[in-house]
């Protein structure tokens, strides 16, 4: 099964609380980043996945593309740019 079809299937199966409104998948760790490391190692995920811990919380957000500010870019190969009037955005 191609990666896109597999990802769509997973998105349909997982309940919505696992995802946050900004488009990244919320991942629960143990406060030291180990939970996010285990998430990245599962299912041979690519090394390009970026994760962002949330301070002292056990939760963080992982993107399958690139994280830009609080959001995930919609495809690979994008750059994160900052516009003074709009904030962070992806340039693809």
UniProtKB/Swiss-Prot annotation:
Where does the UniProt entry say this protein principally localizes?
A: secreted
Q: Which domain of life is it from?
A: Eukaryota
Propeptide position ranges: 25-45
Q: List the disulfide bonds.
A: 63-72, 68-80, 73-90, 78-92
Provide any one GO MF term from the record: ion channel regulator activity
Q: Which UniProt keywords apply?
A: Acetylcholine receptor inhibiting toxin, Disulfide bond, Ion channel impairing toxin, Neurotoxin, Postsynaptic neurotoxin, Secreted, Signal, Toxin
Q: Where in the cell is it found?
A: Secreted
> Would you indicate the residue range of the signal peptide?
1-24
PTM (free text): The homodimer contains 10 disulfide bonds.
Tissue note: Expressed by the venom duct.
The family line of this record is:
Belongs to the conotoxin D superfamily.
Self-association state and partner proteins as the record states: Homodimer; disulfide-linked.
Purpose: Alpha-conotoxins act on postsynaptic membranes, they bind to the nicotinic acetylcholine receptors (nAChR) and thus inhibit them. Through its two C-terminal domains, this homodimeric protein would bind to two nAChR allosteric sites, located outside the nAChR C-loop of the principal binding face and at the adjacent binding interface in a clockwise direction.
Specify the protein name.
Alpha-conotoxin FrXXA 2
Please give the organism: Conus fergusoni (Ferguson's cone)
- Biological classification of the source: Eukaryota, Metazoa, Spiralia, Lophotrochozoa, Mollusca
